[in-house]
């Protein structure tokens, strides 16, 4: 009797797939559109740390679906590549003294080795790397299309500059902390600094980026995050005349009904009217205030927690409806980049205005209340309500009615117009770093921009020794004079020395997979039409705003230019949950590294002081030493065990803690299948009961894969395998279909079993997914509830009349039950036949 030698089996089939290019795909014109599918993982950044067990979760999910679709006769595109430009490689290069290109390519080799060891069905002939010159040539080409369309421009703006990283960061790459703004990557201090930057006019696409979310099957949470980031506001733009002047100040508001409660105007420090209206005696102090405030971040200035500051300009405006004179202030909490850079302040009905008015003793006039009567205002009333203290024609009306009447009055009197505003800012697209795509633009002596011609691409990143940041805000490329200075038509021009951000290459990589070796165009249109859109895109929720928003923007530009055939690139999006790990906390809440923890009698103690620790679930991190390396898992249990365990841990979209005990259970499951394989193989007709169970299993596994409920599909397979073990013989009519439906989850074992049954070629080329027959199914299953302390944790299907001992065993092997009773004392177990198992624990 042979043993399950997973190391030998997995190496054998990985070599076979490589040699025979089993997963190579082409654009077969005979395959109808409904039988084509494009399944995509968010490609990884190849860090020096390699993969951890969290990476393969999404990859395994797409791989299972890919193999399932192959077995159902689909033409499947399932590629992989590497997002290999960007700051991390450059920072690591600076730390180690090794060139970022060498580091990156070494890391990619390691990643590929790890990915291949997990047996994923990628078409490696389509591999892309964003730092490859044959790839970034087309990133540069797309940038030039944006430039020619008027969507790329330069401007000197206050930007986030990180001295430690030596580069400018986009707003999205900066986080606010109690100690001030920090870089998201590396947690370095950042400051505001005026620099000439490239920007992309993503704001031109704001409305479409919101509207077209209706066309995609994405999680509602991701759609909301994108909508909130874009920040659409519908309101009215109102003109306020300045007293004793012909000048006007325009303000944007979403609450025109509150115009009767305006007691002052506030301008952003950078508003162009500030210098015009400020009284001479106040100009020195206001100039100093302006210089200080405009270097602060948007978040610093607008945060509700921050103290609001301001200065009176000495000027007054006239309320267009009430004709009241109101003072004009400048205030830190108003941004020049949002709306008009001016706000009509209604402190009775806005939190920030209320704080500002209280601080500077400005009038507070209530014009809306919940009941339609005056109320004592402890805090501003910001809801809709009934108008009060307003002219007769507007008084005692609901908010929506007042809004309508005010807008109508303003439009008729040419003092306002309806308007839509967005919080979204143009995308800062340049970085003062080396390891990125060179921007294909020249400048003459007058700083006029000259785009490179298509035949001058790629503009190759020069191979240099000193790629450290200059410290002045200039790129390291600025020091390479023979690269920077370009002679053309007898004149000397200078190259743009900034590089593109790390997001550039990932904005369009899903298109290059369709035609990765094309030297004449970024992708052949027929191939784009054949495969697009991406049918399923799986990746982390951390990319909900940046990558997905930027990729959608570039795609829409390419759509407008006629290069792609659909409006949205990713039809369906799934965010896999995070795989966490156990961590240990002392009495002060401090996390203790795992190698300083020991277990005694199901409790955890510090090795240093023997004090008891609390076990919690936390994100894997190097400092806590709780990162699980997939190489170790594969070596000990095999790739198939790891793949199945990651899918069995819980629903794909849930976060769940890694528990090696659960992995051991999966390893036993695969060994059970091997035990069945070792039994006498027979062509005899199986008993009706087994045939019924087989068709139930095929039905459930089929439905679960289609809906990406892999954990319940695996559970169903486990139940059926346990059933088969009870029989002395191995029925070919059962073992053949069960091997096929197992193979997407455990492809190496699936191939080995297929060969064992006498087949010559790959199961994924030669087998067909089995059909279930409803007429063969005998309904002898029951749904039971699994509870902990009377609270339902899961519902599962079991065989009717399952005995109490088996019920308990099923409950204690259930992942959700394991998570809820971990480290608890079991008081008693209550079972009700065919209905429930309730574990009482404390």
Curated annotation (Swiss-Prot):
Which residues participate in ATP binding? Answer: 622
Query: Where found?
Result: Cytoplasm
Q: Does the keyword Acyltransferase apply?
A: no
Q: One Pfam annotation, family name?
A: tRNA-synt_1
Enzyme Commission number(s): 6.1.1.4
Q: What is this protein called?
A: Leucine--tRNA ligase
Judging by the UniProt lineage, the source's domain of life is Bacteria
Gene Ontology biological-process entries? leucyl-tRNA aminoacylation
* CC terms in the record's Gene Ontology section: cytosol
- Reaction catalysed by this enzyme: tRNA(Leu) + L-leucine + ATP = L-leucyl-tRNA(Leu) + AMP + diphosphate
Organism annotation? Borrelia recurrentis (strain A1)
Task: State the family named in the UniProt similarity comment for this chain.
Answer: Belongs to the class-I aminoacyl-tRNA synthetase family.
**Principal place of residence:** cytoplasm
What Gene Ontology terms describe what this protein does at the molecular function level? Answer: aminoacyl-tRNA deacylase activity; ATP binding; leucine-tRNA ligase activity
Q: Which gene encodes it?
A: leuS
Q: Where is this motif: 'KMSKS' region?
A: 619-623
